[in-house]
């Protein structure tokens, strides 16, 4: 029988992370410079505010949303911040190398930082499926692979399907969900006997998770409109996202009560379902012509989210062996697909209204983009899962899953950590 004491990452993590950080610093030194153009001051302030909203969503929103586990709340918040900081640095370089490098050095603007923050958000969504089962050294690998895969996916979609920044980034919901679930499928499945309660939620951590959901709820309109260039499209995106998430809150709380035999509300369902409308309208938020359509979509998304959170995890756990703790991954996979379908429907209606006869071609392109995003997510996720299983990363023992004591110093608690 193997030892249940946690494997130390003292040799692995500092060497791996600091060497990588030194390499990133050298790359920034040799290949980047700031934008020297004189931007309009008003536009500069507005651009910074959007970037600030995205950072709040990532650091506070998603950080606290994943902190509901009874004994893994500290690690959830801190590891999310670690991944965000590393992911933004690598995403800035990667996007620059893929799009600007042939012309010389990579020019860093507020827009490129905004784009990098959104790319790093993909990792924070995916990691919900594996948090508690991996250490920081493994998460560094996951950040590098996922940001690289998403960056290349966006470049391929942009070049082949001729899409703008908003459209190729809005595949992030589907991509992140399937990437995270495929990584989780590769990791050891069940918790050892006697430790099954470790992945359960507790009252105080659940309150922190609700705080994260509130931050995401407030700033989701900024996320869906961040990359749109047209002022009219940005306005439509903000309005439609706001109406959709407002309705999904009402639906989430009501649907959660309906799903319980005694009419009680589940904290776990509400945490993710209140965001359902924002995910569902993400791809088509700038195309929806009327608020009532966004509200209907928010209602449907809220119901799907509650139903999916109740029934889908148990089904997937039995069939695929994916742990039931990744409710956000299940929801984003369903709601991302719903959003893509709504976008295709609206695109067809818009094409018919404009008298354009290439409806089939437009639908084929949209299906091709979605299929490519899912395939790359699954393939890169499986590759990441295989890499994370290598012994070099000193993965925590299964008996120490979902345990802050493996990673944090608590002088007043038991020895042996």
UniProtKB/Swiss-Prot annotation:
Transmembrane segments: 12-32, 44-64, 77-97, 107-127, 130-150, 167-187, 203-223, 238-258, 287-307, 334-354, 358-378
Effect of residue 3 to C: May be associated with low RHD expression, resulting in a weak D phenotype
Keywords: Blood group antigen, Cell membrane, Lipoprotein, Membrane, Palmitate, Transmembrane, Transmembrane helix
Outcome, altering residue 103 to C: In a breast cancer sample; somatic mutation
Result of altering residue 149 to D: May be associated with low RHD expression, resulting in a weak D phenotype
GO molecular function: ammonium channel activity
Cell compartment(s), UniProt: Cell membrane
Expression sites (tissue/organ): Restricted to tissues or cell lines expressing erythroid characters.
Topology in the lipid bilayer: Multi-pass membrane protein
GO cellular component terms listed in the entry, alphabetical order: plasma membrane
UniProt effect for mutating residue 277 to E: May be associated with low RHD expression, resulting in a weak D phenotype
Domain of life: Eukaryota
PANTHER family on file: AMMONIUM TRANSPORTER, BLOOD GROUP RH(CE) POLYPEPTIDE-RELATED
Cited function: May be part of an oligomeric complex which is likely to have a transport or channel function in the erythrocyte membrane.
Family: Belongs to the ammonium transporter (TC 2.A.49) family. Rh subfamily.
Name of this protein: Blood group Rh(D) polypeptide
Gene that specifies this protein: RHD
């Amino acid at each position: 029988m193997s030892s249940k004491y946690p494997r130390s990452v003292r040799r692995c993590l500092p060497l791996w992370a600091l060497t990588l950080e030194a390499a990133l610093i050298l790359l920034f030194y040799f290949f980047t410079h700031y934008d020297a153009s004189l931007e309009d001051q008003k536009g500069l302030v507005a651009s910074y505010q959007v970037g600030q909203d995205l950072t709040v969503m990532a650091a506070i929103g998603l950080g606290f949303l994943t902190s509901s586990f009874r004994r893994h709340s500290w690690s959830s918040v801190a590891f999310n911040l670690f991944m965000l900081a590393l992911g933004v640095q690598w995403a800035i370089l990667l996007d620059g190398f893929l799009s600007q490098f042939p012309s010389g050095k990579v020019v860093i603007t507020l827009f490129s930082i905004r784009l990098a923050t959104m790319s790093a958000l993909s990792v924070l969504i995916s990691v919900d499926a594996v948090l508690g089962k991996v250490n920081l050294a493994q998460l560094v690998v996951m950040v590098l692979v996922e940001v690289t895969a998403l960056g290349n996916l966006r470049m391929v979609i942009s070049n082949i399907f001729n899409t703008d920044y908003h459209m190729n980034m809005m595949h992030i919901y589907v991509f992140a969900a399937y990437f995270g679930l495929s990584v989780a499928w590769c990791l050891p499945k069940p918790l050892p006997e006697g430790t099954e309660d470790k992945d359960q939620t507790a009252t105080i951590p659940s309150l922190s998770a609700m705080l994260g959901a509130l931050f995401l709820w407030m700033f989701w309109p900024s996320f869906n409109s961040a990359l749109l260039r047209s002022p009219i499209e940005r306005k439509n995106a903000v309005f439609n996202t706001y109406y959709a998430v407002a309705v999904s809150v009402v639906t989430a709380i009501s649907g959660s009560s309906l799903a319980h035999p005694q009419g009680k509300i589940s904290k776990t369902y509400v945490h993710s379902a209140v965001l359902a409308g924002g995910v569902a309208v993400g791809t088509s938020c700038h195309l929806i012509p009327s608020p009532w359509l966004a509200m209907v979509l928010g209602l449907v998304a809220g119901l799907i989210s509650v139903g999916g959170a109740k029934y889908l995890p148990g089904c997937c756990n039995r069939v695929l062996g994916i742990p039931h703790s990744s409710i956000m991954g299940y929801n984003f996979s369903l709601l991302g697909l719903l959003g893509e379908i709504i976008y295709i429907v609206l695109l067809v209606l818009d094409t018919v209204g404009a008298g354009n006869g290439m409806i089939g071609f437009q639908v084929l392109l949209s299906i091709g983009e979605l299929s490519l995003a899912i395939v790359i997510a699954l393939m890169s996720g499986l590759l990441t899962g295989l890499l994370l299983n290598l012994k070099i990363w000193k993965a925590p023992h299964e008996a120490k899953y979902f345990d802050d004591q493996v990673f944090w110093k608590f002088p007043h608690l038991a020895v042996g950590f």
